[in-house]
Amino acid sequence: MTSRQSKTNLKNTYGSGKGEPEEDYITPGPFELERLFWKGSPQYTHVNEVWPKLYIGDEATALDRYSLEKSGFTHVLNAAHGRWNVNTGPEYYRDMAIEYHGVEADDLPTFNLSEFFYSAAEFIESALQSDRSKILVHCAMGRSRSATLVLAYLMIYRNMTVVDAIEQVAKNRCVLPNRGFLKQLRELDKQLLLQRRNAQSNEEENLEEKEI
């Protein structure tokens, strides 16, 4: 599946989605979001678990078929799919029990990665439905493109704000999406915030009608 445009398993303590954001929550600006990454994990290794069964890694991790199989990975999301990036694809894993999804993205502030947020998030969520699944989301360095897609997933499916998502990922891996990707995550945050507040408002109105 493709959308155009020796490893150590680390044990981490995970937070949970914080549900509905506070009423006075406002999406921070790009600089404020960047500062959140500075407070995160200083370690940079080939691959890190950032959420249960969800890992962010680099090109070396994705190319190491032996370690992937030994570690039990069942899904791979390549955020740098393509001939001039990390050129793997379904054929690279054809004799392995791995489901592949590729996103052909460039690590440039001008690249519109947001058009892949929902399809990538859906692939991750589908993978995590099985207790036996383990998914690697990678790009070349495992810092920008892959991290951005994982952040979007946590926001879409785990009801996190962009701040919650960054704190969750950054405490487990040294990542830093480019400024353009951060702006796209800000827009996603504002869209999701509006949707959730509207949904909450509708629920409250329905409850009031039932009480009358």
Curated annotation (Swiss-Prot):
Biased composition (Polar residues): 1-15
Active-site residues from the entry: C139
Annotated region described as Disordered, given as residue ranges: 1-24
Presence of keyword Cytoplasm: yes
Subcellular location, record wording: Cytoplasm; Nucleus
Pfam assignment, any one: DSPc
GO BP terms in the entry: negative regulation of MAPK cascade; protein dephosphorylation
InterPro entries documented for this protein: Atypical_DUSP_subfamA, Dual-sp_phosphatase_cat-dom, Prot-tyrosine_phosphatase-like, Tyr_Pase_AS, Tyr_Pase_dom, TYR_PHOSPHATASE_DUAL_dom
CC terms in the record's Gene Ontology section: cytoplasm; nucleus
Domain Tyrosine-protein phosphatase: residue ranges: 46-194
GO molecular function terms noted in the UniProt entry: MAP kinase phosphatase activity; protein serine/threonine phosphatase activity; protein tyrosine phosphatase activity; protein tyrosine/serine/threonine phosphatase activity
Annotated positions binding substrate: H138, C139, A140, M141, G142, R143, S144, R145
UniProt-listed Enzyme Commission number(s): 3.1.3.16, 3.1.3.48
The entry's keywords: Cytoplasm, Hydrolase, Nucleus, Protein phosphatase
Reaction equation(s) it catalyzes: O-phospho-L-tyrosyl-[protein] + H2O = L-tyrosyl-[protein] + phosphate; O-phospho-L-seryl-[protein] + H2O = L-seryl-[protein] + phosphate; O-phospho-L-threonyl-[protein] + H2O = L-threonyl-[protein] + phosphate
PANTHER family found in the cross-reference section: AGAP008228-PA, DUAL SPECIFICITY PHOSPHATASE 29
Family of the protein in this entry: Belongs to the protein-tyrosine phosphatase family. Non-receptor class dual specificity subfamily.
Subunit structure: Homodimer.
Function statement: Dual specificity phosphatase able to dephosphorylate phosphotyrosine, phosphoserine and phosphothreonine residues, with a preference for phosphotyrosine as a substrate. Dual specificity phosphatase able to dephosphorylate phosphotyrosine, phosphoserine and phosphothreonine residues within the same substrate, with a preference for phosphotyrosine as a substrate. Involved in the modulation of AMPK and MAPK1/2 signaling pathways.
Protein name: Dual specificity phosphatase 29
Organism expressing this protein natively: Monodelphis domestica
